[in-house]
Structures are given as structure tokens and as C-alpha cells.
Amino acid sequence: MKKTILSCLMLAGVACSASAISIPDSLNYTARIGYNIGSTAPIGMPATIRKMNSYKIVANVSYGIDVQKDLWNNWGLLTGIHLENKGMEIDATVKNYHMEMVRGGERIEGRYTGRLVTKCDEWMLTLPVMATYRAGRWLLKGGPYVSYLTTKHFDGYVYDGYLREGDPTGPKVEMGNEEGTRGTYDFGSDMRRWQFGVDLGADCQITKRFGLYADITWGLTGIHRSSFKTIEQTLYPIFGTIGVMYKLK
């Protein structure tokens, strides 16, 4: 909540500053606020993930200030700075899923079968660099982005299942559904600080000042470092954003 309030104050401050100073006529400034929905997921559903039991929508917000310049004909360039949150919470059923966890104060590793809950939360500063194409009141855009994570969490627990230590034929460790009998894990320290990807989207100007926008961002780097091997599949951040925008100039 503190981050949200601070972000709103920052965005309001930038907007007021932009209206108080002289902005070159060739530049278009836009303030944005949106909602992110998506997940960190592997490309394709691996055989070890048998079923998605639930997906919990969390409060993912995005604030941004962009500057766009028309260069030739209908083509232009857009960049800016965004403060955004990308998070998820899922419950899945897995089989022979490689995991490392803590149960009863002891760290164990092996092949897990049963229910698994994962929570991921990322706050980041994102810099997009996008080509734009203007078509009437529409502005189509696409290009790469880079994000720096200021906050990163990836944790969860397993329950109603069992772990075979070492390999699928190893000693069996039962997992219950109460806090003392579940296995917990935390891989936040193994997450990358920097993320790279591509962003495709469109802005629609409804009035002279207000409009709507939608974007799809697809991470090209996994959320964990390449040296992280506990989860066998690489997890990519894939999110869509919808929101409103205000043309500062």
C-alpha cells in the first residue's frame, strides 16, 4: 500500500511538472495507470504439471510516463519509465516434480507428487523502447523493454502429497495439509534483478486528453538466474496490461 501511494504521488508530481514547464511541440507526453494480469510460466505445459487447480488474481498495478515523437510519415519512437508490479498465486497438482523444500526444519530434495502452491511478487522499474505507427486515433507500438527489479519474492508450499528423496525410487516423505506437516520453499534470492523482453500494444485516444491502452509483454529471460536448477523448467514473465492514459501534451 505504501508503494502504491508513493507511486501515485510520484506520477502526480511528474504530471504537474510537465504542465508547468515548456514542452517541445514535437514531443507527446502521456501518463498511464493500468492493471497487469498474467503469470510466470514455462513455454508449454510440462508433463510433470498435471493440473492447474486455481489461479488467484492479485493487485498488479502499472504507473508510467511516456514520451513519443513522430519521425517520418506515420512512424515514430516511444520511450518512458514505468513502475509496475507483476505477481501471481497458483495452486497446481504435479507428479515427479523436482523440488527442494524445508520440512520440520530439515532441507530435503527430490521428486514431489501432490499439490503445490506458488506465490510470485515482483516490483520493477521498466524502460520500453518502441517503434510507433499512428493510424487516426490509434497508436500501434512494439519493441524491446528492460526491467530492474526493486522487490522480488518467489515462495510457496507443498501439501497433500509426498516427496521421494533423491530420485523417484528414494525414501518417501509424506506431506500433510497443515502448516507443521507441509513443505515450504523460498527461491526469491535466486531471481534475476534484470529482465528483458518484448512489448506489443496499442493506444486509443478517446478524447483530446483521455484514452485507453492495452499491452502484452513477453519476457525473453527467465525470472531465475541461469544457475538455478531446482525448478527444471525456465519460467518466463508473460503479462497483459489494460489501462487508462492522460495526454499531458
For each of these PLM feature ranges, what is it?
Residues 39-58, 86-122, 149-195, 221-239:
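Extracellular/periplasm-exposed beta-strand and loop segments of Gram-negative cell-envelope proteins
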